[in-house]
C-alpha cells in the first residue's frame, strides 16, 4: 500500500503580516488559521501566484483543487503556482476577511477582530454570472451557493 503524502502546505512568512498556519479544516481539506489575535481592518496576508487573463482561466483544465482568485476586471491569480498559502483560505458567506486589489497585488484584510485559533475566510462570490457551487461554510447567513470562475 502506498503511503499518502501527508505534507501540510505552509504559509510564506514574507506574504503574511501575522503568525498563520495551514491545517485541517472542517470547511474543506485545508484552511488557514490565525495563531495570534488580528485586529479589525489590518492587512493579514497577500494572495500570490501566476498572473492569468480571463481567457487563460476559462481554458484551464481544472485539477481537483483550483486556487484561482480574481484581482480586477482583467487579471486573475493562480495560487497553485507560487502561492503564499493564502490559496488555502476557505469560503464563508459571513467571512472574517475581505480582499482588495492594491497596486496590482491581491491583499486580504480583517473585517473584524480575528481570534487566535480561528479559521480565516473570505467570500468567493464574484459579481458576475458564473457557475454556482454548493456552499458548506456553516455560517448562520449562508447563501447555500456561491458563483465560481470555472465551468
Where are the predicted features?
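Catalytic cores of histone-lysine modification enzymes
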Residues: 2-99
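C-terminal SET catalytic tail plus cysteine-rich post-SET Zn-binding segment of SAM-dependent SET-domain
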Residues: 3-5, 93-151
Amino acid at each position: 500500500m502506498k503511503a499518502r503524502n501527508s505534507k501540510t502546505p505552509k504559509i510564506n512568512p514574507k506574504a503574511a503580516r501575522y503568525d498563520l498556519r495551514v491545517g485541517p479544516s472542517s470547511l474543506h481539506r485545508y484552511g488557514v488559521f490565525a495563531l495570534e489575535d488580528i485586529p479589525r481592518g489590518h492587512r493579514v496576508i497577500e494572495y500570490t501566484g501566476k498572473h492569468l487573463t480571463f481567457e487563460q482561466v476559462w481554458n484551464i483544465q481544472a485539477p481537483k483543487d483550483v486556487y484561482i482568485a480574481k484581482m480586477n476586471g482583467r487579471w486573475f491569480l493562480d495560487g497553485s503556482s507560487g502561492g503564499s498559502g493564502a490559496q488555502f483560505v476557505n469560503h464563508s458567506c459571513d467571512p472574517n476577511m475581505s480582499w482588495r486589489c492594491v497596486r496590482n497585488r491581491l491583499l486580504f484584510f480583517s473585517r473584524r477582530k480575528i481570534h487566535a485559533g480561528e479559521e480565516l475566510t473570505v467570500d468567493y462570490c464574484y459579481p458576475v454570472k458564473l457557475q454556482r457551487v454548493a456552499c458548506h461554510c456553516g455560517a448562520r447567513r449562508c447563501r447555500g451557493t456561491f458563483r465560481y470562475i470555472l465551468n
